[in-house]
Design a protein with these regions (language model features):
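Conserved "right-hand" nucleotidyltransferase catalytic core of DNA-directed polymerases
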Residues: 1-164, 169-175, 181
Length: 181
């Protein structure tokens, strides 16, 4: 297996170090659109709950959960929220806004605001990353030291959502296409 996969190591490293061009204007507009969703949903959630409610706070969500009737729940994950939302239409509305807020926050924080290397989104491919011989990906191994923390460039390419792919553009003489889904 190693002998067969070793030939993939060079292309994996090269692809990760080359990355892909990002259209800065498109990235900014996508990020701004998601920023509007974040602020709109936060205002809506805070109107439906209390003014200092933080959708990312486990404590706040757990308190809300108990207020809405989820007293015996052990956690507040998506499945638990869906279960409570089926019983309580008010909970359904509030959790819908919380989920929209979290989805937009994840999109902005993980993909749209990922640190770029110049104008390029980098990643690291691992040809040995799965048992099924498929490649896995992660943030690039290139980083900057900022005070006491490392800032890695890019994002993992494997789960890049279609919305975030709109900011990518091919280099001159190349095309972008996707063979999965």
């Amino acid at each position: 297996n190693y002998a067969l996969k070793f030939t993939e190591l060079g292309p994996a490293v090269l692809a990760g170090l080359e990355g892909i061009q990002v259209d800065g204007a498109k990235r900014s507009s996508l990020s701004a659109a998601q920023g509007n969703i974040i602020s709109t949903q936060l205002i809506a959630v805070q109107k439906m709950t209390w003014p200092t409610f933080n959708p990312n706070s486990v404590r706040d969500v757990k308190t809300l959960f108990q207020i809405l009737g989820g007293k015996d729940a052990t956690n507040t994950d998506v499945k638990a929220r869906e279960k409570l939302a089926e019983k309580n239409p008010i909970a359904s509305r509030i959790f819908g806004a919380i989920d929209a807020y979290k989805k937009a926050s994840k999109l902005v924080g993980t993909y749209l605001n990922a640190p770029l290397y110049g104008e390029r989104l980098l990643w690291a491919f691992n040809p040995f990353g799965t048992d099924s011989c498929r490649w896995s990906s992660s943030k690039s191994h290139l980083f900057l030291m900022d005070k006491s923390k490392y800032i890695h460039f890019g994002a993992q390419a494997q789960n890049l959502p279609p919305y975030a792919k709109k900011m990518l553009r091919s280099d001159d003489g190349f095309w972008l296409y996707e063979i999965d889904k």
